[in-house]
Curated annotation (Swiss-Prot):
Protein name: Ladderlectin
Signal peptide from the UniProt entry: 1-18
Disulfide bonds: 153-169
Superkingdom in the source lineage: Eukaryota
Stored InterPro entries: C-type_lectin-like, C-type_lectin-like/link_sf, C-type_lectin/snaclec_domain, CTDL_fold
Subunit (UniProt): Multimeric.
Summary of the tissues where the protein is detected: Expressed in cells of the branchial epithelium, hepatic sinusoids, biliary epithelium, renal interstitium, skin, and sub-mucosal granular layer of the intestine. Highly expressed in caudal kidney. Moderately expressed in liver. Weakly expressed in gill, spleen, cranial kidney and skin. Isoform 1 is highly expressed in intestine. Isoform 2 is weakly expressed in intestine.
PANTHER family per record: MANNOSE, PHOSPHOLIPASE, LECTIN RECEPTOR RELATED
Lineage: Eukaryota, Metazoa, Chordata, Craniata, Vertebrata
GO MF annotations in UniProt: carbohydrate binding; chitin binding
Length: 190
């Protein structure tokens, strides 16, 4: 019920002031983390909201960008590394929804880009290319299935469920959602 209320409030806010869903999601994400903090901390957080390079979107302490150019997973990850980034790792439902919105804002829909998950070393032992803990999963029903023993990489927004699918890394999909850490500069309240 709370998520429905929040969704309705976000939709109403978009309609009333023309804010993008990404901006509202960033505000919502910050509000969750601020909780009972004082007014001074809220002002500092608001000042620190947009610390990503142009074309990147901030969620927490990371910046995300969508690249539509189709590549295999290894070439997509190599492209990310050349930009000082990695294919995205996903650590919560809220973060996954944010990534879906980043993709939708660039494509007008739900394309199926790569993210940084892979199990090429051992089947069903998943890792993120950025080395972070694989602590969240959002698989489509029946996945991961490692069809044909050759599906060690992950795409998002798969078919009608818009969840994850394990797939052959050599397939060509949009290069993916890229991420990089951002160093949050905290301004001391005066």
């Amino acid at each position: 019920m709370a998520m429905l209320t929040i969704s309705l409030l976000l939709c109403a806010a978009v309609a009333l002031n023309g804010a993008t869903v990404l901006e509202l999601f960033q505000d919502f994400e910050q509000a969750l983390h601020l909780g009972a903090k004082g007014e001074d901390e809220r002002v500092v957080a608001a000042e620190n909201r947009n610390q990503c390079p142009t074309g990147w979107f901030q969620f927490g302490s990371r910046c995300f960008m969508f690249v539509e150019t189709a590549r295999s997973w290894p070439l997509a990850e190599r492209h990310c590394v050349s930009l000082g980034a990695n294919l995205a790792s996903v650590h919560s439902s809220a973060e996954y929804q944010f990534l879906q919105e980043v993709v939708a804002s660039k494509t007008g829909g739900f394309s199926t880009p790569w993210i940084g998950g892979f199990d090429a070393v051992q089947d069903r032992l998943w890792f993120w290319s950025d080395g972070s803990e694989f602590d969240y999963q959002n698989w489509k029903k029946g996945e991961p299935n490692n069809s044909g023993g050759r599906e060690p990489c992950i795409v998002i927004n798969w078919r009608d469920e818009y969840r994850w699918n394990d797939i052959n890394c050599g397939n060509s999909f949009p290069s993916g959602v890229l991420q990089k850490n951002v160093e949050i500069q905290k301004n001391e309240p005066t």
